[in-house]
Swiss-Prot record:
Name the UniProt record assigns to this protein: Protein TonB
Gene3D superfamilies from the UniProt entry: 3.30.1150.10
Membrane topology summary: Single-pass membrane protein
Stretches that traverse the bilayer: 8-27
Top-level taxonomy: Bacteria, Pseudomonadati, Pseudomonadota, Gammaproteobacteria, Pasteurellales
Known outcome of mutating D66N: In strain: TN106
Gene responsible for this protein: tonB
Length: 270
């Protein structure tokens, strides 16, 4: 109700203000003087604006009413009823039931530590060469017998040394032979990798074998290639020489390897 009354009151005030302003404007409009009309018109417009600003009232928002809740009545201390505590029941043990004996934990046995791995077998030590013992010379023997015994000792020493040398040569020759064979195969593979079949000879279905000799330097380089046996076709011979000249060193030349080598290069069509 209060809000509606306020809104009606504001509306009436605004209508009155607007009526006053309109009447004032009409009154000023009827005056004959143009200058006075212009001056009064300016004054009237300024007054009307001020009146409008003053008359427009902002309606205040209604304040919320504070609703006070009634405090709940606190219970009187005398009327509070305490809940009865449950009676404690005494547990009577049955004498016929024997208590179970507590199990005693046995101490854990320590696990035996793993023994260390056995060390590797000791390397066989090189056997020492057993020197032939000198036979004692009997002083009682005559001079002729002494000469015979001394010559026998010399022969024994010579035989042992010659046998040792022969064994060493056999062992050394075995290792040298394998190394030389491997080096020879490496040179052969290097030459074959650079072998190119001439196109013209291939079209004409020409085949043949070329024997070529060349020098092997200390660093393994190949040089001085020449044909020792022709294949019968000049293009095949030239292809064999080119393969050797283009080949690279496969390593230093091993001891005992010849400084010159001869190989046979085949050109065949399948």
């Amino acid at each position: 109700m209060q809000q509606t009354k306020r809104s009606l009151l504001g509306l009436l005030i605004s209508l009155i203000a607007h009526g006053i302003v309109i009447g004032f404007i009409l009154w000023n409009w009827n005056e004959p003087s143009d200058s006075a009309n212009s001056a009064q018109g300016d004054i009237s417009t300024s007054i009307s604006m001020e009146l409008l600003q003053g008359m427009v009232l902002e309606e205040p928002a209604p304040e919320p009413e504070d609703v006070q809740k009634e405090p709940e009545p606190e219970p009187e201390p005398g009327n509070v009823q305490k809940e009865p505590e449950p009676e404690k029941q005494e547990i009577v043990e049955d004498p016929t039931i024997k208590p179970e004996p507590k199990k005693i934990k046995e101490p854990e046995k320590e696990k035996p530590k793993p023994k260390g791995k056995p060390k590797g077998k000791p390397k066989n030590k090189p056997k020492k060469e057993v020197k032939p013992q000198k036979k004692p010379i009997n002083k009682e023997l005559p001079k002729g017998d002494e000469n015979i015994d001394s010559s026998a000792n010399v022969n024994d020493k010579a035989s042992t040394t010659s046998a040792a040398n022969s064994n060493a040569q056999v062992a050394g020759s075995g290792t040298d032979t394998s190394e030389i064979a491997a080096y020879r195969s490496a040179i052969r593979r290097e030459i074959e990798s650079h072998k190119r079949y001439p196109t013209r000879a291939k079209i004409m279905r020409k085949q043949g074998k070329v024997s070529v000799s060349f020098n092997v330097g200390a660093d393994g380089s190949l040089s001085g290639a020449k044909v020792t046996k022709s294949s019968g076709d000049e293009s095949l011979d030239k292809a064999a020489l080119d393969a050797i000249n283009v080949s690279r060193s496969v390593g230093t030349r091993p001891a005992g390897f010849p400084s010159s080598l001869s190989v046979q290069i085949s050109f065949t069509l399948q």
